[in-house]
Amino acid sequence: MVLSNYKVGAGFAVSDMARAREFYEGKLGLRVSIDSPNNVQYLCAEDSVLHIYLSPEHVGKTTETLASWGVDDIEWVVDELTKRGVTFEHYDEAGLKTDKRGIATFEGDAKVAYFKDPDGHTLSIAQAPRY
């Protein structure tokens, strides 16, 4: 299977970053690996990650990205999954624009492609220096 050889991480929206950080860092004891005002990534066992991002309008809705697989060649994985019938999402909005394959490029050369499962949950594959 294409994705079975890659690590998976989870990411989801929070409505209040300070409150979320107090819980994840203070109560759960998670270690910060990437820190910015609206995005925090925690490094867990065996390099697995939990990513939270500030997006109050998406909290509790299926538009959240629920899991993300870290890959080292996103173009190849997008092509392989497309061949298997996966349809990638396309976005053209402030802060999130995808190319014709459905790949968005972010600061630091991070690349992400989003797709949905049969229930409409948003999942992604990501290529970034930390994956």
Language-model segments: what does each one mean?
Residues A18-R31:
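Amphipathic alpha-helical segments
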Residues R19-A20, P37, W76:
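Short Gly/charged-rich anion-binding patches and loops
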Residues D16-M17, V71-E75:
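Helix N-cap motif at beta-to-alpha junctions
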Residues G11, N38-N39, V112:
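A short, glycine- and basic residue-enriched loop/turn
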Residues M1-L3, V78-Y131:
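Vicinal oxygen chelate
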